[in-house]
Amino acid sequence: MSNVSALRRAVVITAASALAVSAVMVAGATSAAAAVTPKTGGILTFLEHTPRLDHYDPSRIYTGRDLAFMNSFMTRTLVAYNPVPGAAGANLVPDLATNTGVPSNAAKTWKFTLRPGTTFEDGKKITCEDVQYGVSRVFATDVITDGPGYLQVWLDIPKAADGTSVFKGPYVKDAAGLAAFKKAVSCSKDNRTITFQLNKSVADFNYLATYGVISPVQAKLDKGDKYDLWPQSTGPYKIAENSKTQLKLVRNAKWSKASDPVRTPYPDEVVIMFGYDEEVIDQIILGDTIPTAVNFAEPLSTNNDKFFSDPKFAKQRMNNPDPYARYLAFNVKAMPCIEIRQAMYYSRNAKALLDYAGGSTYAGSYATGVISPLLATDYAPTKVVGPGSADFIPEGNIPKALALMETAKTKCPADYKKATETGIKIDTRQSVTLNDTIPIDTAAYARAGIKVVFNPISSGYYPTVMNPAKQSDLSASGWGADWANASTVIPELFASFGGFNLSQNGSDPAYAAFEKGVNTAMLSTDRKKQAVMWKALDVQAMKNFWVLPTIFGKAQFVWGSQVGGVFFWVPQGNPAFGKMWVNN
């Protein structure tokens, strides 16, 4: 899954990249808050640079920060991560369900039974059919976009001639398709137990049940794409205002603590205030002018020393290794010439960008692929890119880049002309740091004769770049495992059925053999052998230069003096927002 706050860090690192999160246990992830009895009441305020979050519809949320936020306050799922500090935070606990799922039939069948007393914000009882309907929505891929795609791949539903599911979602009236879906996702007679029939063994299917793609939605209240503006709550808070300036959540009177062992709502209101300048947000926290405020992203790299060198902020800051791999995603359809893709990698001044972002203290280390080292079982340096590779020079290997461009000049002249005259267009999220990093990148690429043009996107970044018709030549992107298996990294990023394949690599001559390897790895039930295959596929993806990897990172978080209960939540790579409280 991707991560919004880290996207800005990646923009700093590359002037165009992003990140994502995983369920990997982060060694040394710490709580910055002392053990103090939480207080109830007050308004908890989050300060955000962008005009709005990308999505509120639980079926469409796929960024770690927004998952952590919405699942803490509004969206209940069958299973949840335990909201506690340290490694235990990666453990699954029952949420809407009475347990963490019961597998059978070699993990091709999974059952979850709903706990009693759960309701929507209008008081309607949550039933199996509501969860079943929520699951059905993700098959309407022309309407419900941007969320995880695992259900479309794993559920035992027949495929149409074009390889897509015969079930097209609830907005298309097709009795046969609906029947096929309900055979794969069925409800018990008492409407409390939901059963999933899969087309393969998936031993960790219950980790997917922490996502909103498996959460209840009332069919009569579903407004398709517009449900994204005002989804119904099943958690302790509900939306009171969703405007251009703020998202305001208030207590949900229909929620019952007796039916929810995961959440304890402390503030009376939770507000995200949109459109704040990033420097202004940092100054608010530095000056403590809104002591109940939290920076919803990360502080600017230029302000990190102000937060982390001053002892008065000791209880208002965190600096953790994160499980994210940042990179630039090449749009292979727009950039089919591998020599130009390689030349961009070798001409990039990785050291200058890392130094600007804070070096190893704040930014992280040079990436060797897209599988994070924190995903220990599946990680190994690829030795194709980054440290350990023969041609990697942090400042840029300009002779190598120039030689590649010389080859491209005759091998792919049209692409060469685009790279040297028209310019390569790079999608980035709008940030004040671009004023500093664009000149670094522009000068670096120019050493190889490559011209770049940046495309800052101020709102709806992921919905924009995930649309093939709107994506530019490269896009700020990145990924971390959805849970502790690279089956949620390599296929998601590079397979035709992946939910976050920004590389558009299906027409690449190397793709067919690569996908064959992916399918073989996904069918493996021997975890050690599977790990070997994921490592090899990471190597192959780097050799194909479908992405330009940048760093394995670190993340910083800061907040006001009257915010308590802050700790780093391992599986989401963000603070556990639902545990925060106001101390005033």
Label the model's feature ranges.
Residues 83-87, 179-180, 197-269:
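Gly/Pro-rich hinge or "lid" segments in bacterial periplasmic/extracellular proteins
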